Amino acid sequence: MKIVFLDAATMGDVSFAPIEKLGDFVCYDRSTPQEAIERVKDCEVLIINKVLVTPQLIDAAPSLKLICESATGVNNIDLEYAASKGIPVRNAVGYSTSSVVQATFMQILSLMGEGPYYDSCVKSGRYSSMDIFTDPSVSWRELEGMRIGIIGMGNIGSRVAKIAEAFGMEICYYSTSGTGHCKEYPCLSLEELMKTSDIVSIHAPLNERTNGLIGAAEIALMKPTALLVNMGRGGIVDEKALADAIDNGTIAGAALDVFVTEPLPADNPLLHVRHPERLRLAPHAAWASVQARERLVTQIAANIEKGW
């Protein structure tokens, strides 16, 4: 059985041993559309991450029996055409939950605790020249007693809520699906959540309900001391409106791991704010802990072992 992974560069240095033992495994870091067509000609199992699986690509692989998505979302695959050819598509779910939850609090604590400032204070030598034992020039705040408003109370959002509880925070949420299925915490309107939360944390998928959900009007509802965190998808937040809010002091700060266009274009307004210290940006890496990538490989292997 020949197994081809067309764009494995996003997986980093993880071992593919669980997949390698299943057959003849060929792995490419990246594949252009034309390269992809050449590389799938004799494969039976196709693994992709962001490569577009078009009818043309499927037709170029006459022996293809299974498509494995090395992620949860499958919007890069023509599912209807694959089904018409009798080719099953399997994705991976839940592998990155712990990783994203931890990354969420890494960013929140960095913003709330002024970590970069204090680190610079000591390493730059400023602390060594002080005449008192501490640096009182900046203030940081405790999470205890604050309200966190979670947009999207799925697997990740609910785990964020549990950890927020451990910090002594008050939890509320907005249901992007409109079901309000979680009865453990109050489900608020988006307007009320934005107005009353000290931290707004986004953990929703990108769909017709969430695309452009947080724009200038919604950000303007937030407290001037509030933080906005987006660990969901880039298209949920208007990046220009957020950059303006950071510079104008409409909100205290923001952290983003996802963007409308990835990689982030050099002219993106978030890279040119006047107050970068109020902003934490990460290159869509919240999903990618060592353990999460290992779980992902294990899931892909299990999906192949199921057969077709």
What positions do the PLM features span?
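Short beta->alpha connector loops at strand-helix junctions that form conserved
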Residues: 29, 49, 70-71, 87-98, ...
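An anion/phosphate-binding loop that grips the pyrophosphate of nucleotide cofactors and donors
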Residues: 43, 61, 196-197, 225
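Short glycine-/small-residue-rich Rossmann-like dinucleotide-binding loops
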Residues: 51, 72, 198, 204-206, ...
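Phosphate-binding beta-alpha-beta segment of Rossmann-like dinucleotide-binding domains, i.e.
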Residues: 93-147
